[in-house]
């Protein structure tokens, strides 16, 4: 062992002698380093603690009521109640004059500087009463404004940036509609393609990889498309779908645009519930935020048709906020004991709400005019289990679907309530008639679906058993009770989708993937009955000419994609797309033509037919010509490639002959070929003979 160890040492010494001397990394004499600490350690110096004077957590509140010493304690309790929502208050100072009267402002110190910033953000311009609106500022802001130079310097002129045209999509001379198709390429990574529904084939406008984490949504007028990301949401628009604005709200799950696209509401989870933020779309600024217990009906905001008001339901109340200040209307909520649901008219500032039965008092449906808060119609209802409010798109009618019972059964503690002998009523409010008359339609069968005709005076319902239901169509006319005009029996459908232009309807079974296209003009003829197995969505285009059914990967993982049909149910296009997520038509803004001009165009529509037919023929001819030119170009490209390879093959002949033993194998005759037959055993079978 000793000998072996000594050998190892001698070997190590020999190896050490082979190594070169270690290099010297010391700076040469008189060397000057030109790198400063900011360049070398910038990221670390940015985290260096800075000196603080201790006033970062102090806010100054102006426009506080001036009160005498006898009322000071009451004032303190009111102010403390308002400002304590933003954090823990350490100290409050109310300066007073010689007589002890407050001077109208106060200094308030929070536990942390972030709480003071939150107080400025939330409570600045907070209205205490009719005569006092708080002006809240950080104490450090006064020092900042003191350091403003007295000599004014003109701002630097910024170069003009050409604004993106947000409405270019409606300037297409042929008025082709656009749509987007989303497909998931990886977890939390969705590709979105934007297309124009041109003839004979759609035209791809733009495709974005990793455009959103989950899904996309169009704004009501089609100006913007919103994408969802972990830090928040972003809206895009213009010819190339450039980013218009981003709204930081971590974990946003759902958004809602106001009807006129002035505001955006984002809903995101918090550890204790749901945070809701209302944003100004044009400026990107936060207008107001709310905290709710969870994602429920109580937390949802609903907008008036003109963006002037937004409302949400509270416990036994409705909170209506005015825009753009987002203060409560008349600085108070509307107290409505027992309210269970409400909805805005799509064309007027009228709210419909219903109240449940309480202590032998019947349920009630009320129409209230805003901002006057004047009740314009009431309807009492008895034996009510639930109500659903359905406005017609034109605002001409309101249908209240009433779930009624014959008998009520309660347990001993009255916690569990069972309704027996259920039947259903449809209360139809005629909004355009004097004193708003109400008609009633009673159905004794289970109601599976209800849908108004968007433009017209008909509504349809699915009633009966799920696998063998009936579809009934009713017509509503002035001064006459709603009449049953058609009943289609034994139809296996679960949903109803009216065309945006009325007249045509798709009766869909989204469980089995079957569809029936119906024309409701005269005889309610079923024009087509296609099927799309596992289809989970139906989308009409804004003009009512095309219908798309889709199989989303949210529902199944195989055979995802979408089919496109005409309004009569004729198949136009089948698209199989892996991990297809959603298909959305781009909405269109309302037409600028007057009612008289639209009627005149419809009346003289035959006059425009020849021009349209000629344009269609030219388009098809142009498409055929383009197809022939494309094929000719492909053939020329192939022949060019082929000739190039043949020339290369000829140039290599001498090399090829040399490698093949000086035998020209390119021109071998059949006689020079030796044919050899080889036989081998494939399988062996044994047959026993008797």
Swiss-Prot record:
| Gene Ontology annotations of biological process type | follicle cell of egg chamber development; formation of cytoplasmic translation initiation complex; regulation of translational initiation
Question: RRM domain: which residues?
Answer: 57-141
Q: Spell out the Basic and acidic residues composition-biased ranges.
A: 1-11
- Renumbered to this chain, region (Disordered) spans 1-33
Q: Enumerate composition-biased segments (Acidic residues).
A: 15-25
Q: Which residues form a coiled coil?
A: 614-645
Task: Cite the GO molecular-function annotations of the record.
Answer: RNA binding; translation initiation factor activity; translation initiation factor binding
Where it sits in the cell: the answer is: Cytoplasm
Do you know which InterPro entries this protein is assigned to?
EIF3B (IPR011400), eIF3B_RRM (IPR034363), Nucleotide-bd_a/b_plait_sf (IPR012677), RBD_domain_sf (IPR035979), RRM_dom (IPR000504), TIF_beta_prop-like (IPR013979), WD40/YVTN_repeat-like_dom_sf (IPR015943)
Pfam families listed in its UniProt record: eIF2A, RRM_1
Top-level taxon of the source organism: Eukaryota
Q: What SMART domains does this protein map onto?
A: RRM (SM00360)
Disulphide bonds in the chain = none
Per the record, the similarity remark reads: Belongs to the eIF-3 subunit B family.
Summarize the protein's role.
RNA-binding component of the eukaryotic translation initiation factor 3 (eIF-3) complex, which is involved in protein synthesis of a specialized repertoire of mRNAs and, together with other initiation factors, stimulates binding of mRNA and methionyl-tRNAi to the 40S ribosome. The eIF-3 complex specifically targets and initiates translation of a subset of mRNAs involved in cell proliferation.
Q: What is this protein called?
A: Eukaryotic translation initiation factor 3 subunit B
| Gene it is expressed from | eIF3b
